[in-house]
């Protein structure tokens, strides 16, 4: 069985686990770097990106996460997780993991009062998907090697590059698990390709 981890430092961890399990995979909360060895893919959940980065430093996650990515294992960043994955953050020189070749802007849809839901057309999904946006970032620029999966009002809100997937919204906060399933399929494909 495929095992997908959710970085359990803060954010909507339980909801992601529920969504992973609804897709028929095993969901594990990752609280220690050594747990990364036992999973096939990792979700970086929403939360607050600067707090998350501080916790990642405190618990010595940065280097193990880069090694995890270097092994080609899939990673999916949602909301603040997208900011953690991004190569560049607008208005600052301090990227976090710097893996997904995009420039993101934080809180670009406004503060918490501006949380909203929107029907999104996402590449790879037949029917619209309801995206829940909460203090969401968006992708200002995507590199040539990045596939844009979804735009909302002219702003990029989901993108994929190799084994990295990122989105501005919270796919785990609905009962529609198709976006999580896209990621599970990425992890499944990688596992099959690397099986000895």
Curated annotation (Swiss-Prot):
Pathway(s) annotated for this protein in UniProt: Cofactor biosynthesis; pyridoxal 5'-phosphate biosynthesis
Q: Which Pfam families match?
A: SNO
Gene3D superfamilies, sorted:
3.40.50.880
Binding positions for L-glutamine per the UniProt entry: 47-49, 106, 134-135
Catalyzed reactions per annotation: aldehydo-D-ribose 5-phosphate + D-glyceraldehyde 3-phosphate + L-glutamine = pyridoxal 5'-phosphate + L-glutamate + phosphate + 3 H2O + H(+); L-glutamine + H2O = L-glutamate + NH4(+)
Reported EC number(s) for this entry are 4.3.3.6, 3.5.1.2
Q: Does the keyword Acyltransferase apply?
A: no
Active site location: 79, 170, 172
Alphabetized UniProt keyword annotations: Glutamine amidotransferase, Hydrolase, Lyase, Pyridoxal phosphate
- Write out the GO cellular component annotations: cytosol; glutaminase complex
Entries under SUPFAM superfamilies matching the protein: Class I glutamine amidotransferase-like (SSF52317)
Q: Which family is it part of?
A: Belongs to the glutaminase PdxT/SNO family.
Give the record's subunit note.
In the presence of PdxS, forms a dodecamer of heterodimers. Only shows activity in the heterodimer.
* Purpose of the protein: Catalyzes the hydrolysis of glutamine to glutamate and ammonia as part of the biosynthesis of pyridoxal 5'-phosphate. The resulting ammonia molecule is channeled to the active site of PdxS.
Q: What is this protein called?
A: Pyridoxal 5'-phosphate synthase subunit PdxT
The species is Bacillus velezensis (strain DSM 23117 / BGSC 10A6 / LMG 26770 / FZB42) (Bacillus amyloliquefaciens subsp. plantarum)
Report which gene this protein is encoded by. pdxT
């Amino acid at each position: 069985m495929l095992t997908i981890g959710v970085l359990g430092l803060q954010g909507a961890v339980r909801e992601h686990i529920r969504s992973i399990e609804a897709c028929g995979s095993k969901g594990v909360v990752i609280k220690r770097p050594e747990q990364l060895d036992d999973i096939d893919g990792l979700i970086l959940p929403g939360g607050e990106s600067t707090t998350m980065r501080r916790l990642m430093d405190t618990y010595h996650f940065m280097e193990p996460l880069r090694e995890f990515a270097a092994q080609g294992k899939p990673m999916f960043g949602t909301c603040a997780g997208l900011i953690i994955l991004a190569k560049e953050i607008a208005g600052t020189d301090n990227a976090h993991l710097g893996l997904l070749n995009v420039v993101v802007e934080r809180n670009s849809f406004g503060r918490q009062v501006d949380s909203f839901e929107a029907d999104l057309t996402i590449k790879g999904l037949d029917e619209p998907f309801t995206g829940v946006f909460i203090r969401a970032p968006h992708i200002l620029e995507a590199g040539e090697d990045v596939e844009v999966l979804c735009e909302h009002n002219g702003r990029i809100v989901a993108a994929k590059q190799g084994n990295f997937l990122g989105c501005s919204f919270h796919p785990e906060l609905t009962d529609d698990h198709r976006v999580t399933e896209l990621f599970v399929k990425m992890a499944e494909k990688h596992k099959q390709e690397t099986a000895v």
